[in-house]
């Protein structure tokens, strides 16, 4: 339970609020990632939700600070310091932003025991639960003596993950980070990374009546796609991770040629390669280039993202992980194989 703010734009009162009530208030406050809306759109940005939680945090006795990420966008940091000298830090890390939705989806509604609305799962539900838990610990007697608990409500998860990257760049470290992504209420200790790639084939244009005078870049790319979706995907399936299964490759975009009566001189595909713990973007590039050479295929390969998402894995034998498993009655950690 925590101080409530019953209407958007109002100030916290001394009433009490359950996690479900808090989630309703968070859903009512749109926080759509600005990347998905025109500049100045009223639903764009995380500030309204962050300001609301900051006011609640102060009322709950938490230390409130912000870490600027971009103009008008900042991570909200709510800290509960220990009563003694801090020996470890636990980081709670949900995100504030959502993708866009129809206006009615920002009005929460309860159906068959479930609360629906934009961000209810991803991740305003965990944000509400984590906030309420932290507020309860702040009121508890005794409070943690050696553990600092920080709720880092992050911006920009849905686009470029600038919020989490800014947290790391600012030197933040934790002994355990609990990410607010939905997991089906399972303790998850591993998830895949993502590397986006561009492959281009070049040919020579010619008239469609004399294709033998040209070199068809689309045909060349067709062989590359067949290789990636065939032999390469099979090789990835042969080396699965125990929690995540195999790495994957998906050709999600293709473009080439100008019109049917011209032999195309250029073709491009864009590929999503999901990586496993231990794999790196540079290693993926080397692997695909070697595969192309082996099959005598020519294609220009470049990364699409300057900062790919790395795979993550936490030691399943870490004492804090074991405590989580015990509380949940879960025999072993799971992996987010759906990402």
Sequence positions of predicted segments:
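Acidic/His- and Gly-rich active-site-bordering loop/insert found
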Residues: 16-118, 139-145
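An extended, acidic, His-containing surface patch that forms the Zn2+-binding/catalytic region
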Residues: 55, 62, 238-241, 250, ...
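Short pre-catalytic strand/loop immediately N-terminal to key active-site residues, enriched for Gly-Thr
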Residues: 111-123, 329-333
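Acidic/histidine-rich catalytic neighborhood of metal-dependent amide-processing enzymes
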Residues: 123-124, 128-196
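Acidic-enriched catalytic cores of C-N bond-cleaving enzymes acting on peptides and small amides
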Residues: 208-254, 262-263, 277-301
